[in-house]
């Protein structure tokens, strides 16, 4: 580290003046030997006979002279601007600044890095003047390597973030039944019916109270257990209709003619189970591809013999797992919409496309063409708009119409998240899905 000595002409008048002297006004120009050190002073109106020198040690360069600090007790020229006066007064702090420059750096790694960088620049300049920079020795390679290593220590690069994998959650619309486990007799074994898109999150909200997002009717009446859930609705509107009819069986259009009442020896949950089975058999919901799931298997009850759920209703056990579908970013993961295998016309809109649920069948259809084909096979085209179940006209695979619509909505949802160039294309079937298991809640 080079040091600088600050001297004044007024202290040494006997000696001969330096060979070359330059008075600095404002910002000095760069000169060879100043080692890129700059000082800025506003001393345009100061006397030029009082100057100070900055003489680098062990150098043959011309000393740098700067104006000396005027006495603070003296008066400034009235024509001197205030900004210049401030800068002139601030020059009284010049000596401690130079002393700070002379202090060695606290970080030894920084010190060695700066010294090696300086030596490396000198070597490179010598070679350019000598042999034209032809080849580097092993010592120079080592200097370059140390230079890069130290530079990494001084300014480490930020870690690159991992590319975020785009996913969409498969739609889930469910209507559930809760049972109260309260110690108070007035609330014990009471039931509550609700709608949710995430049963595992919803039960925690109910047990957390209204502050956590629970319902008013479940606040301070728990803890609650989510015993069963009915899901597989094509959209949230159908699920909300099912919820309201389950909550109000005496006034709903689907069940008011039956006037369902709780029997004397029937538990509250057994009565709610009977209402759910009646709803699944009603004309409004019997053609949906629904699933009845027992979330707590120890609470399972036999279905009432008078109203067993329809044959196509699936029965499942265990907690619901979130299903995530990958949104691919490569061209080979998408297919063209192509033409309808029934009418032979091109499919122009993605929302009008449906496809077979078989993993090996590549057929695409218009939703209207496939529904009419299924209705004709079952002779239901007079009374219904869409079939309950049918077979694929290409491969013969059995399907439920609710599964066809659920796959169509998944394709549309992926198209809204993918790149713009793939929005009018169909994602492949064999792409991997991801399931998120629910976290077991501690009671």
Swiss-Prot record:
Cross-referenced Gene3D superfamilies: GIY-YIG endonuclease (3.40.1440.10), Zinc/RING finger domain, C3HC4 (zinc finger) (3.30.40.10)
GO biological process, one term: double-strand break repair via homologous recombination
Keyword Nucleotide-binding in record: no
Keywords: DNA damage, DNA recombination, DNA repair, Endonuclease, Hydrolase, Metal-binding, Nuclease, Nucleus, Zinc, Zinc-finger
The protein's required cofactors: a divalent metal cation
InterPro entries to which the protein is assigned, alphabetical: GIY-YIG_endonuc, GIY-YIG_endonuc_sf, Slx1, SLX1_C, SLX1_endonuclease, Znf_PHD, Znf_RING/FYVE/PHD
Domain of life: Eukaryota
EC number: 3.1.-.-
Ubl conjugation recorded as keyword: no
Pfam families the UniProt entry points to: GIY-YIG, SLX1_C
Domain GIY-YIG: 171-258
Family the entry assigns: Belongs to the SLX1 family.
UniProt domain comment: Both the N- and C-terminal regions are required for interaction with him-18.
HAMAP family: Endonuc_su_Slx1
Name of the protein in its database record: Structure-specific endonuclease subunit SLX1 homolog
Source organism per UniProt: Caenorhabditis elegans
Gene: slx-1
């Amino acid at each position: 580290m080079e040091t600088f000595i600050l001297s004044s002409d007024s202290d040494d008048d006997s000696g001969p003046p330096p060979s070359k002297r330059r008075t600095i006004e404002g910002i000095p120009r760069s000169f060879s030997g100043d080692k890129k050190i700059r000082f800025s002073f506003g001393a345009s109106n100061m006397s030029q006979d009082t100057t100070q020198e900055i003489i680098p040690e062990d150098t043959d360069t011309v000393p740098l002279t700067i104006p000396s600090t005027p006495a603070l007790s003296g008066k400034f020229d009235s024509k001197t601007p205030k900004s210049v006066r401030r800068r002139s007064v601030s020059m009284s702090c010049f000596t401690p600044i130079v002393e700070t420059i002379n202090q060695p750096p606290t970080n030894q790694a920084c010190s060695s890095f700066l010294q090696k960088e300086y030596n490396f620049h000198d070597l490179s300049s010598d070679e350019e003047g000598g042999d034209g920079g032809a080849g580097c020795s092993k010592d120079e390679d080592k200097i370059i390597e140390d230079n890069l290593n130290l530079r990494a220590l001084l300014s480490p690069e930020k870690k690159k973030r991992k590319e975020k994998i785009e996913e969409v959650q498969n739609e889930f619309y469910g209507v559930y039944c809760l049972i109260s486990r309260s110690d108070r007799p007035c609330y014990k074994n009471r039931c509550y019916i609700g709608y949710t898109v995430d049963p595992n999150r919803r039960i925690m909200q109910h047990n957390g109270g209204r502050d956590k997002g629970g319902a008013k009717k479940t606040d301070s009446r728990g803890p609650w257990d989510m015993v069963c859930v009915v899901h597989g609705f094509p959209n949230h509107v159908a699920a909300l209709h099912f919820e309201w009819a389950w909550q109000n069986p005496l006034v709903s259009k689907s069940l008011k003619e039956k006037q369902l009442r709780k029997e004397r020896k029937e538990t509250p949950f057994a009565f709610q189970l009977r209402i759910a089975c009646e709803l699944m058999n009603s004309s409004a919901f019997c053609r949906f591809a629904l699933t009845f799931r027992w979330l707590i298997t120890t609470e399972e009850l036999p279905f009432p013999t008078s109203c067993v759920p329809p044959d196509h209703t699936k029965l499942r056990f265990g907690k619901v797992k979130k299903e995530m579908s990958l949104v691919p970013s490569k061209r080979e993961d998408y297919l063209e919409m192509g033409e309808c295998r029934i009418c032979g016309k091109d499919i122009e809109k993605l929302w009008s496309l449906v496809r077979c649920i078989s993993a090996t069948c590549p057929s695409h259809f218009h939703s209207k063409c496939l529904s009419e084909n299924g209705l004709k096979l079952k002779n239901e085209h007079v009374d219904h708009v869409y079939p309950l179940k049918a077979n694929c006209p290409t491969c013969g695979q059995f399907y439920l119409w609710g599964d066809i619509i659920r796959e169509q909505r998944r394709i549309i949802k992926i198209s809204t998240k993918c790149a713009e160039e793939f929005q009018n294309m169909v994602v492949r079937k064999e792409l991997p899905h991801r399931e998120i298991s629910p976290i077991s809640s501690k009671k």
